[in-house]
């Protein structure tokens, strides 16, 4: 049964009375919804079909929030949470819901948003592509853990942020992390607690790449030589690449730091670093990235998502394909690789972060993709007059949560025949879909992507074609 976080009672406030409510549905954040005195009440960890005892925690004019006290009548879709930290840690929020029910909820939420903005009463079943779903556990290849140094007892906590709080929940393992990463959390916690410069440690970022396990430890000051030796010994024993990152963002491999006198250690150039990488296109392409670069955290779903995007675009001889918000080349590399045997096919990747553009160019060079070029640009600006842009036959968009509304205003001048839109926020996808529909495009495929099982987060991808 799910474990519910019990806050300490505020003695200066009189607690509101307990209510017994019937939950009718989930909201887009995965909270149960009920009605009380004409208001919608949002109840985290409550499920549709359940009768629950709750206590109101916040009341607004048109809605209220409540804390779940007891489940009086349980939903058959309720599941036992697999993580001992569930209900305290702020990472997962749907472990109490069976996996198939999670996916059904996400599909329904996506469809409702698309219907709302499209003006269509329903999503055409012929448009509904199969969802891309993930294994329920151990799917995350990347995570950032926070640290907290207690100046009173000189102790250090390592963990994730608590639910709706900046407090840190110390953890020993995490069932949604790739197993090598989960297994590192407790050893890292013990190691960092022993260091002399605990007060100078920031967050810890863990990455499981195809070429090994990487850890980046943020430091605010140069560490003493004894700490460097302890970190280097740990990296060697665990068989990981352990990097330190200073205030400037510079990275240093602890194995290449020569211990100096008491003041610290000597730093080497970033060019000496081994960078994490992952394969695309059934191993035909390798994508390298630096810690801090954005990459999709679910490796298995990313592979299938990229393959589906390439298939949907249906590349042809002589076409020019634009990949906007391209990052380090996640889609561009696969598109260019598929197009190597198509005479005259060209892929152009555009990204707003200069460091990622440089890494993308390195990736194109490493993979010998002569039909691929990358450019740095302000993605909110009109790029239609850029000399390097030219004719665009097909378009791939993979924007951040804010979506691609500004870009779509000038992209209509290019009139690409097909548009694949990959979204980490269905609300902005639905909004931008209405723009594409108004420009003469038709929605041909819509796929829900369950990139983050056990959480409310929904990703999606859609294919639009210009009406003929």
Curated annotation (Swiss-Prot):
The active site is at 424 (nucleophile). Residues 12-70 form the TRAM domain. CDD domains: AdoMet_MTases. Transmembrane segments: none annotated. Keywords: 4Fe-4S, Iron, Iron-sulfur, Metal-binding, Methyltransferase, rRNA processing, S-adenosyl-L-methionine, Transferase. Its EC number is 2.1.1.190. [4Fe-4S] cluster binds at residues 83, 89, 92, 174. InterPro entries: 23S_rRNA_MeTrfase_RlmD, MeTrfase_TrmA_AS, MeTrfase_TrmA_CS, NA-bd_OB-fold, SAM-dependent_MTases_sf, TRAM_dom, U5_MeTrfase_fam. It is an enzyme of class 2 (transferase). GO terms for biological process: rRNA base methylation. S-adenosyl-L-methionine binds at residues 296, 325, 330, 351, 378, 398. It catalyses: uridine(1939) in 23S rRNA + S-adenosyl-L-methionine = 5-methyluridine(1939) in 23S rRNA + S-adenosyl-L-homocysteine + H(+). Coiled coil: none annotated. One of its GO terms (molecular function) is RNA binding. It comes from the Bacteria. Catalyzes the formation of 5-methyl-uridine at position 1939 (m5U1939) in 23S rRNA. Belongs to the class I-like SAM-binding methyltransferase superfamily. RNA M5U methyltransferase family. RlmD subfamily. This is 23S rRNA (uracil(1939)-C(5))-methyltransferase RlmD. It comes from Shewanella denitrificans (strain OS217 / ATCC BAA-1090 / DSM 15013).
């Amino acid at each position: 049964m799910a474990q519910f976080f019990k806050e300490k009672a505020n003695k200066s406030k009189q607690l509101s009375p307990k209510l017994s409510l019937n939950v009718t549905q989930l909201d887009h954040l995965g909270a149960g919804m009920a009605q009380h005195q004409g208001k919608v009440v949002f109840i985290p960890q409550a499920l549709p079909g359940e009768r629950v005892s709750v206590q109101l925690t916040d009341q607004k004019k048109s809605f209220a929030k409540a804390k779940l006290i007891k489940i009086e009548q349980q939903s058959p879709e309720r599941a036992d949470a697999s993580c001992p930290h569930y209900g305290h840690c702020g990472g997962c929020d749907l472990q109490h819901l069976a996996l198939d029910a999670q996916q059904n909820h996400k599909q329904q939420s996506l469809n409702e948003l698309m219907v709302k903005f499209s003006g269509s009463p329903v999503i055409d079943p012929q448009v509904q592509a199969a969802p891309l779903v993930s294994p329920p556990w151990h799917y995350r290849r990347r995570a950032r853990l926070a640290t907290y140094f207690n100046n009173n007892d000189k102790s250090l906590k390592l963990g994730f942020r608590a639910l709706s709080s900046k407090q840190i929940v110390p953890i020993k393992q995490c069932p949604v992390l790739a197993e090598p990463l989960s297994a590192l959390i407790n050893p890292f916690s013990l190691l960092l607690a022993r260091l002399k410069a605990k007060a100078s440690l920031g967050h810890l970022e863990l990455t499981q790449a195809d070429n090994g396990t990487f850890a980046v430890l943020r430091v605010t000051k140069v560490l003493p030589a004894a700490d460097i030796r302890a970190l280097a010994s740990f990296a060697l024993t665990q068989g990981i690449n352990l990097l330190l990152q200073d205030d400037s963002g510079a990275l240093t491999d602890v194995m290449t730091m020569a211990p100096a006198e008491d003041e610290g250690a000597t730093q080497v150039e970033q060019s000496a670093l081994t960078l994490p990488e992952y394969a695309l296109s059934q191993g035909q392409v390798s994508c390298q990235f630096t810690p801090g670069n954005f990459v999709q955290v679910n490796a298995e779903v990313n592979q299938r998502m990229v393959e589906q995007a390439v298939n949907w675009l249906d590349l042809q001889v002589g076409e020019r394909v634009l990949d906007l918000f391209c990052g380090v080349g996640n889609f561009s590399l696969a598109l260019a690789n598929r197009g190597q045997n198509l005479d005259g096919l060209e892929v152009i990747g555009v990204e707003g972060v200069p460091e990622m553009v440089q890494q993308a160019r390195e990736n194109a060079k490493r993979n010998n993709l002569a039909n691929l070029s990358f450019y740095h640009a302000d993605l909110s600006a009109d790029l239609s007059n850029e000399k390097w842009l030219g004719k665009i036959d097909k378009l791939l968009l993979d924007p951040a949560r804010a979506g691609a509304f500004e870009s779509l205003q000038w992209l209509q001048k290019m009139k690409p025949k097909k548009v694949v839109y990959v979204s980490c926020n269905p609300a902005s996808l639905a909004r931008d879909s209405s723009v594409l529909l108004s420009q003469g495009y038709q929605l041909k495929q819509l796929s829900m992507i369950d990139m983050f099982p056990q959480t409310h987060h929904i990703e999606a991808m859609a294919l639009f074609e210009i009406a003929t």
